Amino acid sequence: TVYIDDEAVVFGSIYSPGAKNVKIFGGGVLDNSTEERITEHCYENHTKGTFRIYNCENIDVSDIILTNSSTWALSMFDCKNIHIDNVKIVGHWKYNTDGIDVVNSENVLIENCFIRSFDDTISIKAIYDYQKPIQNITVDNCVMWCGWGKNCEIGIETDGIEYKNIVFKNCDSSTNIQLISSKFIVPFSKFSCRYSRSHSVKCV
């Protein structure tokens, strides 16, 4: 268990490979402003961002604030049974500052979150490294506000086996939504998007 007191500001990041049955909560701030900033693609240069997990199961993150991320603020790779609830993300670093990235993961619920990011707010993607399906992903009752990116994007990285049972609902979006953008041939099934307010929805 990781508890961040609601009056605390912690400078650093959370990084975990292979963790199980972890709860992270508390209402405080996790500030990533001390991590090195680079102007190239941060993922390729091993910058971790504020919160990154690999191959994890049964992770619950609630009520914390993530800010000033050097790259994707909250990202998960090859994870399952992840619950993100009432998390606030604020980041204006203009290079690769996605809000939440769900990569080759399954059984993920993201709800009641506020995300202000310069790049994509929520991005669901698959990369060649894992070659696993991405399935059972729900985004519910979230407020999303991006800069030059997209709100709720599926892609552009779609190098996976299958996308299945993905739902966006009851969300407020500040700008356009790019639902599907693929450079690979990938099967999609059971996809649903029900927004309360947004400017436009686009599938490409």
Model region roles, listed by residue range:
Residues 1-204:
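Extracellular/periplasmic carbohydrate-active domains that bind, remodel
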